[in-house]
């Protein structure tokens, strides 16, 4: 069902995407404002750093291994990104998508300046526009490349000269 009062990109203060997948990794990406600065932030936590199979929320991911990278965004770039996310129909997604237990869990949330929060999550089930949302994130921070890195084992990182 379409909202009668659609959210405008200029009303958004934070957009966050979180996933925990079968590779034993958790990923949190967000585009947000801190004061007058717009940022894109990425945090990845490999679950072998903490208790086995412990479920993590996005804030825990940022605190376990810390923020992997943070880059400034212009307000125009953030608004274009927000417009792309809203174009995926996130406002109209169900609160929860239940499906097969494929060990993939995802959450997306949008926080508005009014305090309103729009959120959706799923376990093995996805709205039809999900890949459009992933493409919007990929355009912002190369998300597909990051998710491929998440599948790498510690030995793979060492092979590429990354300390683990």
Question: What residues fall within each predicted segment?
Answer:
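Short, well-ordered, aromatic-rich surface patches in folded extracellular/luminal domains
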Residues: 1-23, 61-69, 76, 80-164
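Short, flexible N-terminal segments of the mature chain
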Residues: 26-62
